[in-house]
């Protein structure tokens, strides 16, 4: 046991300020995602056309070539969609989707039917044969046929080969008078304008979130209007349809383009107002959230739906929108954390003083709200039992580490004896984990979320403990000192990659600076006291 020694009077206010600020941050963050946000209203709740993929249940994915969706399931989906949409767009003839036109006809819906073109010529030929048969069987239901979706973007066919596929379908169904098109990101029509010669109308995708220069929500619809006008000018006399446009409700922010439910609702409402004002053919993406896309595109890939995976509308087209209706659970998590931290320490004499209890309450509340924040992110991001197990284990470790740190900090602030820092291997592990994830964000961060709620509690705990440590409770190893310098540098790179427009990257920088500063403060004190001996990594 370390005898009580009062921390410097200069650091006490800073330690208390850090605890109060962390608790207030938890209060404010949960409150702001729970407030109702007034948005422009859509002219109607009906939408002209929506992308339809039925793969919304656990384990369903078109990446499984043997996947099959029954006609009964498609019927149930289209019956629900017919209440809000006049048309659905499909992307393939496989997986049972060739039944969509016949079923859509029952509900008075039109279909923008897709024929999937990929790299395999055999699969392409099978798709085309099935598509031609469907077109000839149900021409009156089809608003158009899309031969290939973003094939040039994926680099799976040359423009010449793709044009041959489109022409093959167009010639085969000429007598049905069903128009044939190809769909791709708008820039690729600029790169390959010759594709316009083989289609009846031009179908462009405009996704402001995914632009090379991401567009902020407030400017997104104006961006769509500008691009649409530009494409009309570049292809004079040709009909141009927006084949995909939308906004994600969850996932990583790209520069100023924040994925959120409020922003998705804002975008859809403003886009529908714009589309109605120019009488423009369009299709929005997409009907249902698609969990399988999270494997390819991270969290954000799974949350472009207007309906969730249970076929429930995620937001209305009129009235205010709330980002998180269950926001009070975040506050309750803070209260639970405060109670847990007090119960974990109150049985020892050194934590019974009033100041010590205040410190435990503030620490527990801040930790509880932060881990609730992390759990909310996990709710949207985790795809399977393994990911839940790994993420849950890390959260438990963060909780246990923070409890141990809070007990030590509370004893120092309360003037009681301390019993040493938590296991130094835990400290090293958190620094190593933060460094490793920082490297992943820098070199492979396009689809990775910022796990802020996981790292903030231990980072802040170690920082406050370093401020209050008057002895040699923590002498950082050489490896820890190296990571203390590297972590902020990596975080600065993430800020620069988002050109300073992403608040999450700034918070990530704050986490790295906080934990890095803790190590450097401890080292500076050890040098001053002459307790710094050559250190190596913990065995």
Which sequence ranges carry the predicted segments?
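Aromatic-lined carbohydrate-recognition surfaces of secreted/lumenal glycan-active proteins
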Residues: 115, 170-190, 237-243, 280-290
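Aromatic- and acid-rich polysaccharide-binding/catalytic face
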Residues: 107, 113, 143, 149, ...
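Conserved, mostly hydrophobic/aromatic
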Residues: 50, 88, 145, 202, ...
């Amino acid at each position: 046991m370390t005898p009580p020694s009062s921390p410097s009077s200069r650091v006490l206010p800073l330690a208390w300020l850090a605890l109060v600020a962390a608790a207030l941050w938890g209060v404010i963050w949960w409150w702001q995602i729970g407030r109702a946000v007034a948005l422009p209203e859509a002219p109607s709740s009906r939408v002209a056309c929506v992308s339809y993929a039925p793969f919304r249940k656990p384990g369903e994915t078109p990446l499984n070539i043997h996947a099959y969706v029954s006609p009964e399931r498609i019927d149930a989906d289209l019956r629900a969609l017919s209440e809000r949409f006049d048309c659905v767009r499909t992307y393939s003839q496989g997986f049972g989707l060739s039944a969509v036109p016949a079923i859509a006809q029952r509900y008075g819906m039109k279909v923008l039917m897709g024929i999937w073109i990929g790299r395999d010529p055999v699969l392409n030929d099978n798709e085309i044969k099935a598509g031609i048969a469907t077109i000839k069987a149900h021409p009156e239901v089809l608003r158009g046929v899309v031969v290939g979706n973003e094939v040039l973007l994926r680099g799976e066919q040359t423009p010449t080969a793709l044009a041959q596929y489109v022409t093959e379908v167009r010639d085969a169904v000429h007598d049905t008078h069903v128009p044939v098109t190809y769909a791709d990101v708008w820039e690729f029509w600029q790169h390959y304008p010759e594709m316009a010669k083989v289609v009846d109308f031009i179908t462009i995708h405009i996704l402001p979130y995914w632009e090379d220069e991401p567009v902020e929500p407030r400017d997104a619809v104006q961006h769509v209007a500008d691009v649409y006008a530009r494409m009309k000018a570049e292809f004079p006399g040709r009909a141009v349809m927006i084949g995909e446009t939308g906004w994600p409700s969850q996932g990583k922010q790209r520069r100023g383009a924040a994925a959120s439910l409020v922003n998705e609702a804002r975008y859809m409402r403003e886009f529908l107002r714009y589309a109605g004002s120019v009488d423009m053919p369009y299709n929005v993406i997409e009907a249902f959230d698609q969990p399988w896309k999270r494997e390819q595109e991270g969290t954000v890939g799974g949350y472009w739906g207007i309906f969730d995976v249970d076929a429930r509308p995620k937001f209305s087209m009129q009235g205010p929108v709330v980002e998180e209706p269950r926001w009070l659970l975040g506050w309750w998590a803070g209260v639970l954390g405060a109670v847990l931290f007090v119960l974990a320490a109150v049985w020892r004499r050194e934590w019974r003083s009033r100041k010590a209890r205040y410190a435990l309450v503030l620490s527990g509340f801040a930790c509880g709200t932060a881990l609730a924040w992390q759990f909310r992110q996990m709710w949207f991001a985790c795809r399977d039992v393994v990911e839940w197990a790994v993420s849950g284990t890390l959260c438990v470790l963060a909780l246990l580490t923070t409890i141990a740190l809070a007990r030590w900090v509370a004893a120092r602030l309360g003037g009681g004896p301390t019993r040493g820092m938590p296991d130094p291997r835990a400290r090293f592990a958190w620094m190593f984990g933060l460094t490793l994830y920082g490297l992943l964000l820098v070199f492979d961060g396009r689809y990775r979320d910022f796990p802020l709620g996981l790292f903030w509690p231990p980072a802040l705990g170690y920082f406050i403990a370093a401020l209050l440590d008057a002895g040699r409770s923590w002498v950082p190893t050489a490896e820890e000192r190296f990571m203390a310098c590297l972590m902020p540098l990596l975080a600065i790179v993430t800020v620069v990659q988002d050109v300073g427009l992403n608040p999450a990257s700034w918070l990530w920088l704050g986490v790295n600076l906080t934990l890095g500063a803790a190590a450097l403060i401890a080292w500076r004190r050890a040098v001053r006291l002459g307790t710094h001996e050559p250190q190596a990594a913990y065995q």
